[in-house]
Design a protein with these regions (language model features):
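C-terminal catalytic histidine-bearing segment of alpha/beta-hydrolase fold enzymes
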Residues: 165-214
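Short beta-strand/loop motif that positions the catalytic acidic residue
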Residues: 148, 153-156, 160
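Mobile cap/lid helix-loop segments that gate and shape the active-site cleft of serine hydrolases
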Residues: 105-144
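Short beta-to-alpha linker loops that shape the active-site pocket of alpha/beta-hydrolase fold enzymes
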Residues: 22-26, 100, 187-188
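Primarily recognizes the serine-hydrolase "nucleophile elbow" in alpha/beta-hydrolase
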Residues: 42-110
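Conserved serine/cysteine hydrolase catalytic core
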Residues: 140-149, 166
Length: 214
């Protein structure tokens, strides 16, 4: 099934083979979501091979927590994940909509803003056995950037109250020429204007065309 907000941003989705991934969320569940999506990605690769679909041009995408997880899948070569879920077939590109790129800095932002009690969802996500510093070191995408990192398109609003725009800047500085950053002026966390949605659609379509023409 297509989640409506993704359907809205992908113009040529009828031409794509689309897989949706679910993952565990909630209090004290870290890092289950990361492991879930990496294992799900391998299942997708295996299914694509079985159905004789191309595995050379896979693009992973997600928004918010899903953006963070899409980046983790794309950068999983550098993630010490010792299990049968490892695969040599990596995504060709990642589309990241306002996902976390540096966990500790995002947590600090939430503590400083604190627009309501318990607004720091990152600390809620972490079990007692995993410190903020450890989680940030291992599960922050910017710490996993390497020479084989895929091309990434990031879409982020400058007025995001949950994942600050600075997170996109950090990734841009780390990925350099492997990164395209689409800044949505005054954009928040979801709920972009119709004009911004149109710009997002156009940029995603261009990014996909550039990705697939190679």
């Amino acid at each position: 099934r297509w989640i409506k907000r993704f359907h809205n941003h992908f113009i040529d989705h009828e031409k794509l083979n689309v897989y949706m991934i679910g993952y565990r969320v909630g209090e004290d569940t870290a890092p289950d979501a990361v492991n879930d999506v990496i294992c799900a990605y391998k299942e997708i690769v295996d299914d694509a091979v079985a159905k004789n679909l191309s595995v050379d041009d896979i693009v992973v995408s997600g928004a918010s927590a899903g953006g963070h997880l899409a980046l983790m899948v794309g950068l999983s070569n550098e993630y010490n994940f010792k299990s049968s879920c490892n695969t040599l077939i990596k995504p060709k590109a990642v589309i990241n909509l306002f996902g976390i790129t540096e966990i500790e800095k995002n947590s600090q932002f939430l503590d400083e803003e604190k627009f309501f009690s318990f607004s720091n969802y990152i600390k809620t996500w972490l079990p007692e056995s995993l410190t903020l510093e450890e989680a940030s070191e291992k599960f922050s995408p910017i710490n996993l950037v390497g020479p084989n990192s895929p091309q990434v398109l990031t879409i982020h609003g400058t007025k995001d109250d949950w994942v600050p725009y600075d997170q996109a800047i950090l990734l841009d500085q780390k990925l350099k020429d492997k990164h395209q950053l689409l800044t949505i002026e005054n954009g928040g966390h979801y709920g972009f204007s119709d004009e911004a949605d149109q710009i997002i659609r156009q940029n995603i379509a261009e990014f996909l065309r550039d990705t697939y023409k190679d």
